[in-house]
Amino acid sequence: MVRPEFFVNILKEQGIDFYAGVPDSLLKNICAYITDHLPAEQNIIAANEGGAMGIAVGYHLATGKVPVVYMQNSGEGNIINPFASLTDKDVYNIPVLLVIGWRGRPGVHDEPQHVKQGKVTIGLLNTMGINYAILPKDEEGAAKQIKIAVDFMKATNECYALVIEKDTFDTYKLQSVEVNELAMSREETIQKVASNIEDNACIVSTTGMISREL
């Protein structure tokens, strides 16, 4: 497995130390390490993946450096517009290193909402013309692949995607935990809301934990 510290340090050695994105369960150890070890201004958690791409573009235009945008593959569709209108080689030709957690990979059991997205993850990258590689799960292989990605971006100014499979990164536990004094948990809040609506009312919720709890 690849230690989060190793991954972040290899990128730093290549001159990459700015991150924007939407946290993902497959990337949780990387996200935790970045949160603990980088200033807040170097790790921007965006409202959505398209917004993260916009932030990354602004960072590159201001510094000339390559940013990282991290996401779950379920957010891949959200980057199509900023990619096609800003970063693509036919427009402004701006390099962004995409780190994409591959939920629902064919042949790997996952929750139903990830199945279709898992099937089309690589196809979407091909359609957008984004070069990519599946990050090796050993540190030597990962380091070599990161260098290939960075060399490609420096030579072409194009985006490059590192696709992350399950169990690629070693465990890292977040140290800088923010303690809040909120009185209710998510589960309790959902229970209160659900118990106070009409029996024949329709509840629309997101895929994932909230729908499971309902």
Where are these regions (language model features)?
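Thiamine diphosphate
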Residues: 1-122, 126-130, 134-214
